[in-house]
């Protein structure tokens, strides 16, 4: 006979944990086990109607968080740690009290605010967190840029029209995401800041590639050691120079002219206008680096992008492609395992925004083979399946 937990004792334990979560867990593994079981328990005890409500109102946390940020609600609460009256929040937000109260009521259910007494609202730790630039930008990006695409996704899944993405349908635009952002500076800024900040505390490809000894050994000053293909503002060039300030050889940042005009000022970094859908003009470089580019494109386009590098790789046996992207494991972990929900959601986001996807290891190997390349090795560097795929021109084709 299996022993049963005392529900009241379990409730008391959860209250204690909620009051001081940092004191409860010995390590991250234990914490992740708890998170997994807590989610499973919450789902298991739901009534069917409660499950339905959770699903159909799923977009509201993001929608109300955007309202809270955009209308100054979170700012007003953060400035009133002892509590702000509904009238005061209404004045700060410019919203009618009726709809504002509905918004605040929902924010309270999500822990984004607290009604300490009738009509008095206080900030919570989540209120303050949502005012941090990283989270502010994340909410703006996913609400303004992605949410319309998510809504349109089902309508385009079986669309035969080439280039018709859920993003274009959701935004009522004929422009792709990156072109569209050029005329939407608020959303563009939020996206780029979020993309840079979300990875700031995580390991990077340079934690698993000893660039100075593996890539740059015997490099001469006139040699090209690093080409950052579609490298945006040059943050990876900056990271490389910061780690190896005396690195010999040339470092080249490639992107569209409009992007290069906003690039970081990195000592020793050259800039070059280049469309990676055309042939790579720099030959014989040691490293051609593509960071989070290929997951924005379907297989035929990825194969084309990769093939555009074949001539550049032809004559230097030390030339390599370094593809910094998600590499999902071929053997799927349990759906409740840490990070699985995130990577599954990200793959759907790629489908909605670009008609693309995240790829498993066997998919990457097939893709590179189709392009005339071979995988040298794959090195993973985060628990979210971030990896660097090191590839070269197929040996039998190397000097054709």
Where are the predicted features?
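Short, exposed beta-strand "edge-strand" segments with a Pro/Gly-rich flavor and a Y/T-containing core
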Residues: 116-123, 168-177, 203-215, 290-297, ...
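N-terminal auxiliary segments of SAM/dcSAM-dependent transferases
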Residues: 5-45, 98-197
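Single, functionally critical "micro-switch" positions that shape active/binding sites
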Residues: 123, 200, 255
């Amino acid at each position: 006979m299996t022993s049963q937990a005392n529900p009241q004792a379990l409730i008391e334990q959860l209250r204690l944990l909620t009051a001081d979560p940092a004191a409860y867990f010995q390590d991250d593994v234990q914490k992740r086990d708890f998170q997994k079981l807590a989610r499973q328990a919450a789902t298991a005890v739901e009534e069917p109607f409660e499950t339905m409500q959770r699903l159909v109102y799923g977009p509201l946390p993001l929608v109300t968080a955007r309202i809270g940020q955009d209308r100054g609600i979170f700012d007003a609460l953060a400035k009133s740690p002892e509590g702000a009256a509904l009238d005061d929040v209404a004045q700060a937000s410019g919203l009618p009290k009726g709809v504002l109260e509905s918004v605040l009521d929902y924010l309270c259910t999500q822990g984004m605010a607290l009604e300490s007494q009738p009509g008095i609202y206080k900030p919570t730790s989540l209120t303050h967190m949502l005012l941090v630039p990283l989270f502010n930008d994340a909410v703006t990006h996913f609400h303004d840029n992605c949410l319309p695409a998510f809504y349109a996704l089902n309508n385009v899944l079986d669309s035969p029209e080439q280039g018709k993405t859920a993003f274009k349908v959701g935004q009522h635009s004929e422009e792709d995401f990156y072109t569209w952002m050029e005329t939407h500076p608020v959303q563009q800024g939020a996206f780029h800041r979020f993309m840079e900040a979300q990875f700031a505390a995580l390991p990077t490809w340079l934690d698993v590639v000893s660039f100075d000894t593996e890539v740059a050994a015997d490099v001469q000053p006139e040699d090209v050691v690093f080409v950052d293909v579609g490298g945006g503002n040059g943050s990876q060039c900056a990271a490389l120079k910061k780690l190896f300030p005396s690195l010999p050889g040339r470092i080249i940042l490639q992107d569209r002219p409009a992007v290069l005009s906003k690039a970081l000022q990195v000592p020793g970094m050259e800039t070059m206008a280049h469309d990676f859908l055309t042939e790579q003009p720099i030959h014989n470089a040691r490293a051609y680096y593509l960071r989070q580019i290929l997951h924005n494109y379907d297989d035929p386009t990825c194969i084309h992008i990769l093939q555009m590098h074949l001539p550049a790789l032809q004559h230097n046996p030390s030339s390599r492609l370094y593809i910094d992207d998600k590499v999902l494991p071929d053997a799927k972990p349990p759906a409740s395992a840490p990070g699985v929900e995130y990577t599954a959601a990200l793959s759907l986001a790629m489908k909605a925004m670009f008609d693309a996807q995240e790829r498993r290891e066997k998919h990457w190997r097939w893709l590179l083979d189709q392009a005339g390349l071979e995988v040298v090795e794959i090195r993973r560097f985060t628990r979210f399946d971030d990896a660097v795929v090191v590839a070269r021109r197929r040996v039998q084709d190397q000097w054709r």
